[in-house]
Amino acid sequence: AEIDFSGIPEDIIKQI
């Protein structure tokens, strides 16, 4: 997914 700190990307959250 595209990295958007404005709403926090779900893909990044799942990786964490």
Swiss-Prot record:
One of its GO terms (biological process) is killing of cells of another organism. The keyword Secreted applies. Keywords: Cytolysis, Secreted. It is found in: Secreted. It comes from the Eukaryota. Expressed by the venom gland. May act to induce hypotension. Presents moderate hemolytic activity at physiological concentrations (micromolar range). Does not induce mast cell degranulation, lactate dehydrogenase (LDH) release from mast cells and antimicrobial effects. In vivo, injection into mice causes an increase in nociceptive sensibility, but causes very reduced or no edema formation. It also reduces mice locomotion, suggesting an increase in anxiety, but causes no alteration in rearing (standing on hind limbs). The primary structure of this cryptide Pep-1 is identical to that of cryptide TyPep-1 from Tityus serrulatus (AC P84189). This is Cryptide Pep-1.
